[in-house]
Swiss-Prot record:
Gene name for this UniProt entry: pgk
InterPro entries cross-referenced by the UniProt entry: Phosphoglycerate_kinase (IPR001576), Phosphoglycerate_kinase_CS (IPR015911), Phosphoglycerate_kinase_N (IPR015824), Phosphoglycerate_kinase_sf (IPR036043)
Homology family: Belongs to the phosphoglycerate kinase family.
Amino-acid positions noted as binding ATP in the UniProt annotation, renumbered to this chain: K208, G296, E327, G354, G355, D356, S357
Pathway: Carbohydrate degradation; glycolysis; pyruvate from D-glyceraldehyde 3-phosphate: step 2/5
Protein name as annotated: Phosphoglycerate kinase
Quaternary organization: Monomer.
EC number(s) per entry: 2.7.2.3
Keywords, comma-separated and alphabetical: ATP-binding, Cytoplasm, Glycolysis, Kinase, Nucleotide-binding, Transferase
Gene Ontology CC annotation, any one: cytosol
Organism the protein comes from: Streptococcus equi subsp. equi (strain 4047)
Amino acid sequence: MAKLTVKDLDLKGKKVLVRVDFNVPLKNGVITNDNRISAALPTIKYIIEHGGRAILFSHLGRVKEEADKEGKSLAPVAKNLAEKLGQEVIFPGSTRGAELEAAIDALEDGQVLLVENTRFEDIDGKKESKNDPELGKYWASLGEGIFVNDAFGTAHRAHASNVGISANVEKAVAGFLLENEIAYIKEAVETPERPFVAILGGSKVSDKIGVIENLLEKADKVLIGGGMTYTFYKAQGIEIGNSLCEEDKLDVAKSLLEKSNGKLVLPVDSKEANAFADYTEVKVTEGEAVDTGFLGLDIGPKSIAKFDEALTGAKTVVWNGPMGVFENPDFQEGTIGVMDAIVKQPGVKSIIGGGDSAAAAINLGRADKFSWISTGGGASMELLEGKELPGLAALTEK
């Protein structure tokens, strides 16, 4: 990666501004999954072990008005991080002002301070999300010309806390997480060891058009599963019953199939039910067609076998999007089958592109078997599309 990284800097005695991604799920003030906090530890530890004074910025959820602040404070995150680091995390509870500035000025080498949720600045004119120049300049002024971006999850957005700070410091560099994310995903797509197989699931073709187009050029095979299967089916005149279908994307699906040169691999059967939630009957379709009054909610056993065969010998696999409604035990076999088919390939570099696929791997006990699980759904999708990420573009060149 031709950008400066945290290892290229002298950090001792410096106030180091760090954008992390602590956008973790909270239920009644309790963090239900702290993976993103753990993912930021290597960079934070490196800074404090090298005598830097770490000043951390993160958003949490969406905040549009005063009422949205309820339950969106980073206070529980500060507590969790302090436990993980084994030291105090100073939390003034504000995004600007005299109290925050005094706390930063009082920092000693090796100490950590967490600024309050950056999106609290969105209440007045979306200053964070719209990259307000004054806010970026103010936050940059809290440090000493050094900014470390370690938030891959927001790298596809130009916000005041990433692009805004970057524009107002002498050196904007990548943290270890950002560096790894880019290395794994970009290298997999740009210079993969072959055979390179991409697997795309999820419900909407519209979310994945750019990704499918880019990967059809780069991958040896692109396997399609999940709800978007049925838009591809209908585009070919296959009966889909009550299955999910994007009627306005039938032409796109048809054109993708036509230009795929056989690289696009679709399921050959489905697990169908007579309703999404309160169903009374679940069965496997005979072939591709879904029965009248039923909807496809997972790929079927023949499809799992077909995908297993398509993955045989693969050296690079990128997977984004589950094969079915994996949260329901009745419709998780497809996702499990595909995960198992990926991880059993000898010497495979296996990458999960964040979002629901990451949740599936974690919830279904397969996370430790993958080479890399991305922390950013939207950002990894844009990398897979071949787009440049604003948060990355704003970093200083080596």
